[in-house]
């Protein structure tokens, strides 16, 4: 009786703990959202596309080296029309996606992992850097995660079943619609479908395949339509291709690339830093061994989207890198959590129980504590990136008639352009520079001031110029000032996190 009572108490404690973690995760995301940090360059570039285009035009290749699924863009467009063109409207869908993802991850975790592993998985998912950060960024990666998790909740309970026509149409239509809202949806669908066939007995394989063909057909038609309407044209963007072109394996036998990509995954998109990514890899390996021995079918299902994505990467169709594969993070987190839980609970079954317990506690602390502490600080000190709004306000307040404004081209200039209209500036009031970013500070002087004057009529005959640098590494500020001092005299300076401006009297 006492044992049953203790087990019930532990079970209740774990349930309440998991609930508290979910509430904490939602609270942190809301704190970040309410802090209303300025859009940084990449967000601003996407925002300008959303604001300046019609719904039909959002089907065309985006300007400013941006790419996003049409469904995501349409929701963003709708929110700006309903709630106004501002940061809150633009980040509302990623926020909703982040909160829904927490709940969906909990549901998937209940199916996939043990009761001990579940709160570990939830706290990692809630607090790890990139699952948290992208929940409040104007990008599609938060909704990628949400859609991947929702599709798992939809399809996994239907594995190895002969479905009636209503359910076939349901999964077919929902999958077809999801493809338009998330580019990697096709890998989740293909992976789960393949995993289903692998786990189905040989006698049932043909029946299952024939039964699901209408749904698969709808998925393929939807993906083919979106591919030829949007993705194929995006792939013609040389800048985007160059940005990700080195992220593919050289050959199908490029195992070095595979090992490197596997290792990098734990740093980004999972978000384990420095030595902690190695510890996370260890926990993942332990968890994988546990799954393969105790729950091989679940392991195949969890890893099936990963293998489908890798197949596309080896075909040079989708980069296996960074934020583009954030949607795979939940599956790895579940395995990591089970690895930690295995060590924590093995003391009941091993003569070396103390060592397993110590190892489990150590791994749990090393992997959870840094992310938990970092996430907790956001309650009081929300994360900022490139706070250009106060910089523009300062310029507006201190600007004199005839002053010029110079800002580097690319994302930083898009950031300034997004906010310029809100402060009464038109495009004729500032010049976009010829440098996308000041990566090499020496270029600033070697190109010479003449190029700055010749690039735009707005800069000609300007005696005072405000040089605005959002997104420039703080360490490079002295180099910028050094070169500016050679072409003028500094009159003023103002800085905010991730952005600063110099006012110079030109020689």
What function would you assign to each model-found segment?
Residues 10-13, 17, 21-348, 353-506:
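Membrane-proximal helix-loop-helix interfaces that form the catalytic/acceptor-binding platform
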């Amino acid at each position: 009786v006492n044992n049953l009572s203790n087990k019930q108490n532990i079970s209740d404690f774990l349930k309440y703990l998991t609930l508290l973690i979910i509430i904490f995760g939602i609270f942190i995301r809301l704190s970040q959202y309410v802090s209303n940090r300025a859009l940084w360059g990449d967000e601003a570039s996407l925002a300008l596309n959303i604001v300046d285009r019609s719904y039909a035009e959002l089907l065309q290749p985006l300007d400013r080296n941006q790419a996003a699924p049409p469904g995501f863009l349409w929701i963003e467009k709708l929110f700006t029309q309903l709630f106004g063109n501002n940061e809150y409207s633009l980040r509302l869908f990623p926020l909703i996606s982040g909160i829904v993802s927490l709940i969906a991850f909990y549901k998937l975790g209940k199916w996939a992992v043990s009761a001990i592993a579940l709160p570990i998985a939830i706290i990692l998912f809630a607090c790890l850097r990139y699952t948290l950060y992208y929940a409040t960024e104007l990008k599609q990666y938060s909704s990628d995660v949400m859609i991947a998790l929702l599709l798992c909740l939809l399809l996994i309970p239907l594995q190895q079943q002969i479905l009636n026509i209503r359910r076939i149409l349901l999964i077919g239509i929902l999958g077809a619609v999801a493809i338009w809202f998330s580019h990697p949806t096709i890998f989740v669908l293909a992976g789960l479908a393949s995993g289903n066939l692998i786990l189905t007995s040989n006698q049932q394989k043909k029946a299952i395949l024939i039964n699901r063909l209408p749904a698969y057909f709808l998925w393929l038609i939807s993906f083919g339509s979106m591919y030829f309407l949007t993705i194929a044209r995006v792939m013609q963007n040389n800048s985007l291709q160059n940005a990700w072109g080195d992220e593919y394996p050289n050959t199908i036998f490029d195992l070095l690339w595979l090992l490197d990509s596997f290792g990098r995954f734990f740093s980004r998109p999972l978000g384990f830093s420095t030595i902690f990514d190695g510890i996370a890899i260890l926990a993942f390996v332990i968890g994988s061994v546990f799954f393969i021995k105790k729950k091989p079918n679940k392991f195949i299902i969890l890893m099936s989207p990963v293998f489908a994505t890798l197949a596309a990467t080896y075909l040079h169709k989708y980069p296996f890198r960074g934020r583009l594969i954030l949607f795979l993070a939940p599956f790895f987190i579940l395995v990591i959590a089970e690895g930690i839980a295995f060590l924590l609970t093995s003391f009941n079954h091993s003569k070396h129980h103390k060592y397993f317990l110590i190892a489990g506690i150590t791994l749990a602390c090393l992997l959870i504590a840094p992310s938990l502490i970092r996430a907790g600080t956001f309650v009081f000190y929300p994360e900022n990136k490139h706070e250009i709004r106060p910089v523009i306000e300062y310029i507006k307040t201190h600007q004199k008639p005839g002053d010029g404004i110079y800002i580097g081209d690319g994302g930083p200039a898009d950031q300034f352009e997004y906010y310029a209209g809100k402060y009464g500036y038109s495009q004729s009031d500032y010049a976009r520079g010829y440098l996308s970013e000041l990566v090499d500070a020496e270029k600033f002087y070697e190109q010479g001031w003449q190029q700055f004057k010749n690039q735009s009529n707005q800069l000609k005959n300007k005696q005072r110029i405000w040089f605005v640098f959002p997104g420039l590494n703080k360490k490079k500020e002295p180099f910028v000032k050094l070169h500016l001092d050679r072409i003028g005299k500094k009159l003023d300076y103002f800085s905010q996190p991730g952005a600063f401006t110099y006012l110079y009297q030109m020689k």
